[in-house]
Amino acid sequence: MHTNYDVLGMADLAAGMLDLTETEVLEEVLDGEGIGRTGRLPKIMTLEECGQFVKERFSLPNVKIFGELNKMVATAAISPGSGKSMARPAFEAGVDVLISGDIDHHTGIDMADCGMAVIDAGHYGIEHIYIEDMKKFLEKELPALKICTAPVRQPFQVI
């Protein structure tokens, strides 16, 4: 299930966090809008460097990478939240790496075997940026209200 914000905001926000250029919709839903974005990374880098870049941009302690760490990547697809359903559209778009969350073992291995790397930042790893974005929007639209946010917490523990 996707929300209106998934179609009209989340992917653009995430693509902006990665400084993607020449962006396009990954999977069109309606009238040129849709889920995910593709684009050019700010520079060509190794997959390992891209993983570090994603960690830094989204303030993450770790990411899971499928693919050869020394592979050079220049283009990316980003699909915040669960990205398993975006594997085929990303592959068909011909990008070097899919950046998403909730990529299962077999999908990640299959994509890497097909030549497309995957960076799994976790379901909430990318989507947590929604909170601050929505807070700013509400503060602008409703200046008389004090907008408070809850701290971001993963719904599980990694030990």
What are these regions (language model features)?
Residues M1-I159:
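Hydrophobic structural segments
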